[in-house]
């Protein structure tokens, strides 16, 4: 594990793990941003994920810490199907809410399939009348749901209703909704959208344009 990736705390979740990086060295969570890893063929390599979140093209974790944001990275203990991965994200959101000092709204960030799963997890919590206290959700280059996944989304209202919804689509990536910068923003299910001028970073979770856009829209 790289020295700068060592978390201040680790939370054991059912089917997953969260690495916790409080801002400014304060050993408590006050203003959290949850960043969700994509499920893979085996356990999440959270060390590698931490490298990507704080990658050379845009060190998002460092930038968040500079703004006083506490970062929680969420991964999975093993290969995770839709239901298992979604439950890990649900528990991570609820644990963060319970461990947070104060009442600052949280943010959730997911890329690729993680964006789709986080979207479903938040909508499902709302459908169950469970408070997640997430003020903003950011979907980065989300995968398109399969027919079965879309059916699951539809059963919980398709989108979370309480957070402000942000969508980032990198250049050269198919937009989740099939939209682009010339389309009417009102045709999107998201409140804000960035159609980035550059491609997705190969070394970082976001490129500079995407990272700056995200930071300016945090609650």
What do these predicted regions represent?
Residues 1-15, 30-31, 66, 70, ...:
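Extended, composition-driven regions rather than compact fold-specific motifs
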Residues 7-76:
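Short, surface-exposed "cap/lid" segments of acyl-processing enzymes
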Residues 14-22, 152-158, 218:
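A Trp-anchored, charged/polar loop motif used as the substrate-binding/catalytic surface
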Residues 32-36, 70-75, 105-109, 136-139, ...:
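Structural recognition of the beta-strand scaffold that forms the well-ordered cores
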Residues 39-42, 77-81, 112-116, 142-146, ...:
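Solvent-exposed loop/turn segments at secondary-structure junctions
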Residues 64-94, 98, 106:
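Well-ordered mid-protein domain cores that form the structural environment of catalytic cofactors
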Residues 87-160:
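Serine-dependent carboxylesterase/thioesterase catalytic core
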Residues 154-219:
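C-terminal catalytic-base region of ester-bond hydrolases, centering on the histidine
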């Amino acid at each position: 594990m790289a020295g700068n990736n060592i978390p201040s705390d680790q939370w054991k979740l059912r089917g997953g793990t969260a690495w916790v990086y409080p801002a400014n060295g304060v050993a408590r969570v006050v203003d959290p941003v949850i960043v969700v890893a994509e499920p893979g063929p085996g356990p999440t390599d959270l060390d590698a994920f931490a490298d990507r979140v704080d990658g050379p093209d845009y060190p998002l974790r460092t930038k968040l810490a500079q703004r006083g944001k506490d970062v929680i990275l969420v991964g999975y203990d093993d290969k995770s199907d839709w239901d298992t991965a979604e439950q890990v994200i649900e528990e991570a959101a609820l644990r963060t809410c319970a461990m947070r000092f104060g009442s600052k709204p949280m943010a959730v960030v997911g890329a690729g399939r993680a964006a789709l799963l986080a979207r479903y997890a938040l909508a499902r919590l709302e459908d169950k009348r469970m408070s997640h206290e997430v003020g903003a959700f950011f979907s980065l280059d989300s995968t398109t749901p399969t027919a079965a996944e879309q059916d699951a989304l539809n059963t919980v209202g398709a989108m979370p209703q309480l957070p402000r919804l942000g969508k980032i689509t990198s250049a050269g990536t198919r937009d989740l909704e099939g939209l682009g910068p010339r389309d009417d923003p009102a045709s999107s299910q998201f409140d804000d959208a960035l159609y980035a001028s550059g491609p997705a970073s190969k070394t970082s979770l976001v490129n500079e344009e995407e990272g700056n856009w995200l930071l300016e829209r945090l609650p």
